[in-house]
Amino acid sequence: GMITASLVQNSNFKNKYFSKYTDKNNTDWIRISLDASDQGKSPNGSSVRVELAQKTKWALKGTHSFTYTFFGNCSNASEAKFTVGQFLASKLPNANGKATDRPLCRIEAEQGKIVAKIRNYYEADKVDEINGDPIKIELGAWIPSKETTIKIQTEDKKLTIFRDGEKKESITFTEKVLSDERNYFKAGIYYQNKDSPQIFTEIFLKNLKIE
């Protein structure tokens, strides 16, 4: 199917790396699946991914939020590990001088649970062992067929995660995360372990809203 013009206008998202949408009966669900994502390759490694990326970028100054609803179908939910929404700092140089996006908050389906993983620094993945593991916030069980609504909210450097309207936890970014760096939101499937691409997964997204 084709994505509707109204959804394109209202969502403030552009598509990248994926080829399939469904919008049956004007429900405005967007389908993202392995059969779409296997056409792309992440520059961060060999993992396939699909994504909707925010067009405009924002800084931690002020209040910003990203809300979306999703459900899915997974052939092995107890083993699959993938990101289904996140925000990143845009194009910060690494030790080699190459500009790289830095994930600060990921919402992941992780072996039957939904978790938030938060980095309180900009370091690249390869040096995480030096700087410590991300902060992990458990958001409850992941039942693929059940609709789940996630809200990621920032108020200056205070980050709060909501699930289905319930506040789960807040953390405050340290001085290592700067207020004036530009950030952006993404939604999609980003596999987090080598076995997940062999597990059939499809996610349906709707009501994507940035404020």
PLM regions and their residue ranges:
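Short tryptophan-centered beta-strand motifs in secreted/extracellular beta-sheet-rich domains
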Residues: 68, 145-154, 159-161
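Short, surface-exposed beta-strand/loop "edge" segments at domain boundaries and coil↔beta transitions
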Residues: 36-46, 91-99, 121-130, 169, ...
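N-terminal entry module detector
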Residues: 1-17, 182-186, 211
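Ligand-recognition surfaces built from glycine- and aromatic
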Residues: 63-65, 77-81, 172-211
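Secretory/extracellular carbohydrate-interaction modules
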Residues: 8-117
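Short, contiguous, pocket-lining structural segments
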Residues: 60-62, 140-144, 153
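Short, aromatic/His-centered strand-loop micro-motif at the edge of beta-sheets
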Residues: 116-149
